[in-house]
């Protein structure tokens, strides 16, 4: 998953030499509430679905109310058909889903995504339960990788809401980092004033890996723009910042969302009526 997310943030660039078929290390996607974690997970799912290596398993507590992104890839039905959603409503249902993964007749996924880890851990906040769930997630991804064989490996990303990057503000973060060597932090980006939602995404693939950063902007119409984040950008005039960012931006279209004929029609309708995260 780390590689699928990196390619999303790198505007869909191809994998670097020697990385073809590599899923990358297990990754934690961290950010405050409403920091667009679901949107980035969905973008990574569509990216992986287009690689031709297998389906994508997207696990979340409740059905999405609508497509998190309005993008050209989100309107490609063949990509959407390769993303399979599962909605375990409790931590026990989640554990059962993972434990029975070897019995599932569905195609083996090349990417496993879990959204809203904090909601499941809230039911049993013990460190033992967090460690057990993390280990089971890794075991499930390893099992999928074994089944894929020569076709590649199964990536894993887990989204966890936390208020700050400080470990003291996330009780299980030090423990979870032992299982997930890669992390991507989503933080408010002060350089994005005037945008509907602007975040700074910081990606580290491991302790010895350099940190790579981007500015991610979401507009009301569903358009997402990604530009390299540069500390010196704060020293530029607004005109120069706009010019510099525009030359490297990824713009994902903001046309209307798919209509009733979309493969996700029905899947995206929540029976609970609860609001989904974006």
Curated annotation (Swiss-Prot):
Q: Name one GO cellular component term.
A: nucleus
Q: Which GO terms describe its molecular function?
A: ATP hydrolysis activity; single-stranded DNA binding
Note down the stretches annotated as region Disordered. Answer: 237-278
Q: What is this protein's gene name? A: Swsap1
- Fill in the subunit field for this protein: Interacts with ZSWIM7; they form a functional complex involved in homologous recombination repair and stabilize each other. Interacts with RAD51, RAD51B, RAD51C, RAD51D and XRCC3; involved in homologous recombination repair.
Name this protein carries in UniProt: ATPase SWSAP1
Q: Establish whether keyword DNA repair is in the entry.
A: yes
Organism whose genome encodes this protein: Mus musculus (Mouse)
**Known function:** ATPase which is preferentially stimulated by single-stranded DNA and is involved in homologous recombination repair (HRR). Has a DNA-binding activity which is independent of its ATPase activity.
